[in-house]
Amino acid sequence: MPSKGIAVYSYISVPGYQIEFSVPGSTILNTSDDNFTAKGLEVDSSNIPGRLHFTGRFEWRVLQSDNVIHSAYNDINSLTGKVEEGTMTATVDFLPIVTEDAIITYGFYVAGHGKVGLTNRHQCYVTICSKDNATWMGSVAPSGSLQAQLPFSRFVLAAPHDNGMNSMTSCEAIFAAADEDTLADLRKFLPPLRFFDHLPNHLLLHKLPHVVYGLAITQKKEVPLMLALGARYFEFRPAKLLPIFRKLSKLPDKFYFQHSCIPGLAFDDFLAQQVEFLDAHPDEFVVVHIRWDGVVKGCERPTQEQIDEMLDEACSLAQQNPVEWGGRECFSEPIDALRRRGQRLICVVEAEKYDSWTAKAYATLTAEPILEQFEAMTTEGQEATDLTILQCQATSQSIKEVLVYSVMSARAATSCLTSTKALLDTQTLPWIRRNALQRLQAERMIVVMNDFIDGATTDTSIELSRQRLAVDYGQKEY
């Protein structure tokens, strides 16, 4: 009988919570014992009442003491595999749920028929982490404790990959006025557009939002929510709009996060949100790493003086607890010494990093090449750098066939970036938990980076921070 498969994943770190996944005729109930596992369900027409009825409901429910805290569903046609309607039909609708004691995040990928290596099974994940993650640094290194006398570099920090690309708002302001002349300019700056040379300009112009969505939108949460989840490291690529974009849009003339030349969050807004969080959480820190990897030359970059001025202006917004900013020298200083000075916004520019990412390895739909990169990293490799970065997300959009297929079949929840999110996390995050501290023992800060930041990623960084800040850390065998 016709059926459509759904792979389901969950992560739970708050006691008393369970996640139920169901389709007609079948139910899966996950607890924390099922973290980092993949399970499968089938919307099978044989379980759908009615001779010519093919549509069945896939639903997940978050339960606490048998009470339903939240739920979401999609109605799936078992004959075509398509999602006909539901509450998870567009990525922009996947808003986190904040309860009295937990933060729930989730995602759903609408799969096609398994073309170009992509999965033919819909993908759904749900994660539940503690609201206490908002104050985790104060918990693992309380003021006055022995842990807080250790260098800041002992922290392991979770990072939202391309955090400034969490919305299409800036892009939509440009695309609303884009024409074929705009497209001609964009072809010069966005090499992946050559993959669509077979399309007439008017059709490519129509598809442009889908191209950008598949290339660049790697987050879906606002910065305050990322911070509440426990993210503490943010790479930012500030630059002004391309001249042609300035002419087209009514966006303010200021510095934006840039993905090549695709604009995201404004830098001043980003800094203001960081300081607002630090002002309300006096034991917490944030690291901002300013870089310009891949930013096209036509996008004007801020000078160091301008960066300093924007940092000063942002820090001046603090009302309750002083917030000062510092540089890479803060990494080697005791945590409590930084707290006493109020130096809790650490900003580095083009710092040296020891990074797992390479273009070749990460152009993948599976975890194996990424795990091989992890396996090759050593303590010796860390020594000459400021930061060690373990990237969990694939850049499958750099595979021509994958990007083209995702764009041409685009719906609101079909970005190729979402197709691998949950499956990769079930392999990369457990590897990091088991092996990172054994393999990487230099006195350097470690960063765990991921797309669509979630509780499983942030909890990983918190647990490793707790281990690295243990008084007997240097004597342990991992």
Q: Could you say what each language-model-derived stretch is?
A:
Residues 214-220, 267-276, 317-339, 363-381, ...:
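A Trp-anchored, charged/polar loop motif used as the substrate-binding/catalytic surface
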Residues 216, 226-229, 235, 300, ...:
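N-terminal cap/leader regions of alpha/beta-hydrolase-fold enzymes
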Residues 2-229, 242-280, 285, 395-478:
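Long, acidic (Asp/Glu-rich), low-complexity accessory segments flanking structured domains
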Residues 160, 239, 291-295, 350-352, ...:
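Active-site beta-loop-alpha junctions enriched in small/polar residues
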Residues 154-157, 232-236, 286-290, 345-349, ...:
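Structural recognition of the beta-strand scaffold that forms the well-ordered cores
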Residues 235-243:
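Substrate-binding cleft and catalytic face of glycoside hydrolase catalytic domains
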Residues 341-419:
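Aromatic-lined glycan-binding groove of carbohydrate-active enzymes
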Residues 258-322:
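Intrinsically disordered, low-complexity acidic segments that are enriched in bulky aromatics
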